Amino acid sequence: MKIIKTTLVAGLISLFATFSTFAEKVKIGDPGWTGATAIANLLAAVVNDKMGGEAELVPGNNTAIYGAIDRSKGEIEVHPDIWLPNQQAYTNDLVPKGTLKLSSKPYEGNQGYCVSQQFAKKMNITAIEDLARPEVVKAMDSDGNGKGEFWIGADGWASANVNQVKLRDYGLYDAGIEAIRAAEAVKNARVLDSIKKGEGYAFYCYKPHAIWGMADVVMLTEPKFDEAKYKMVQPKEDADWYKKSYVASKDALKQIQI
């Protein structure tokens, strides 16, 4: 975490080096996931305490944040947690136009799917395909609708779109898994509640993230990253994105930037 914090601060300083003054307020977008909110607050503290400026956090999803940055009217000037290639549909548009500049020092992020250690041991779950077993699906059905709940992310997340496709191409929908989109705070609460009640629950997870300190969870294995099996089209690129996408391997390590 110290390395990440140092990288973030260095990235922020280099990114803001072109700003002529901090007399005016710097508006930092907050896309709402736990890691992004933490980073946004860290960046705000750096601006306020180290750079003599004034920072304001502005909530919004990725589409709203990138749209505001692209308009260059001071509505939002910083995206605190850019995961690439997840968000490249936005960066590939804005960077060449000159309305978005990426920090020069990225750090790595790892994403996948998790269950609690308790649930993994109880049901002998180690890999993503284990979630397709009938007894596992049944154990993940908390509302009695016959579907096992699997949190894939929040509305507006590029990663949630990837996860929606992945679960399909891993055959989990056919096995009875139901993809759930909800705010990350809802997911965090559900993870803790499922452990307390001894229930099954699966969810999209990534590192770095606070969940690893909040609960005893394990990331499941997936087929190793295979570029031939990773063809993701985001809604911004094509309205028929879901049909045209095919993702059946683990994500490559991500480059995270400001």
Region locations from a protein language model:
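A local structural motif
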Residues: 24-27, 48-60, 144-149, 168-186, ...
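Extracytoplasmic "Venus flytrap"
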Residues: 25-41, 62-63
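Sec/Tat signal peptide C-region and signal peptidase I cleavage site
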Residues: 18-23
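Ligand-binding pocket segment of bilobal, Venus flytrap-like solute-binding proteins
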Residues: 68, 76-80, 151-231
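C-terminal lobe and pocket-closing loops
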Residues: 213-258
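N-terminal segment of the mature folded domain
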Residues: 62-117
